[in-house]
């Protein structure tokens, strides 16, 4: 079997979540660090596809946990962005750097906080992620969690001694008086133009709600979206208590 053939078969097996095929291909000499024609690594594909068992197989066969896919995408960051907690734990257990920086300055913790993934945030902090390492725009993680509106992420950061508590309290209070739906819609209009159709959804999450605003095309299909949690009142209480006890 040629290298090209084994690479193609390995990626097909990962796409199809076929663990037995992955095992067979690796035993037959397929490179666990194979990349496709776009430069994507097999490990990154498995990580963002939430396939922890295949991630473990590739790591055990020698895939480097921190190797960037397509030159800029870290497997740990991809898993964190998707909320794939078990994959995050597998990568950390294999030696992935908890503060590895990928393209545009993102770390896995920055992605987890931006998306409000509490379990991933807890796993990263338990794995050694710096609770005070600034995100890509230079803001402290606690401020990012307060803006997101995720009480669970704020609790996790406070439990690990995160600083910038006064700034985070100010951010939580700022969002308390804002119309979350209107803010999300405005950000989409700024990016895609005004006079567009939108639809809003609300879902329970993290003891509160998550507000999702989607931009629709002329046929009514969603083409872009943004979301935000609404736990800012609870977050303000958590931060007030933390400041009072410090």
Regions found by a protein language model. Give the residues of each.
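Ankyrin-repeat-protein effector appendages
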Residues: 1-9, 155-246
């Amino acid at each position: 079997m040629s290298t090209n053939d084994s690479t193609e078969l390995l990626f097909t097996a990962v796409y199809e979540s076929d663990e037995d095929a992955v095992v067979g291909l690796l035993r037959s000499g397929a490179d666990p660090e194979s990349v496709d024609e776009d430069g994507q690594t097999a490990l990154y594909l498995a990580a963002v596809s939430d396939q922890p068992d295949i991630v473990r197989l590739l790591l055990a066969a020698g895939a480097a946990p921190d190797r960037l896919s397509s030159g800029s995408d870290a497997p740990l960051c991809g898993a964190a962005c998707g909320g794939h907690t078990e994959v995050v734990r597998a990568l950390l257990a294999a030696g992935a750097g908890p503060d590895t920086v990928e393209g545009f300055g993102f770390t896995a913790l920055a992605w987890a906080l931006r998306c409000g993934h509490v379990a991933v945030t807890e796993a990263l902090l338990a794995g050694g992620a710096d609770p005070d390492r600034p995100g890509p725009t230079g803001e402290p993680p606690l401020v990012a969690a307060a803006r997101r509106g995720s009480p669970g992420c704020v609790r996790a950061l406070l439990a690990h001694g995160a600083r910038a508590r006064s700034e985070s309290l100010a951010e939580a209070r700022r969002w308390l008086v804002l119309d979350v739906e209107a803010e999300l819609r405005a950000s989409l209009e700024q990016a895609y133009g005004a006079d567009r159709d939108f639809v809003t959804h609300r879902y329970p999450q993290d003891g509160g709600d998550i507000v999702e605003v989607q931009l629709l095309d002329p046929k009514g299909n969603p083409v872009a979206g943004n979301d935000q949690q609404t736990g800012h009142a609870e977050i303000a209480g958590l931060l007030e208590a933390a400041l009072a006890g410090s």
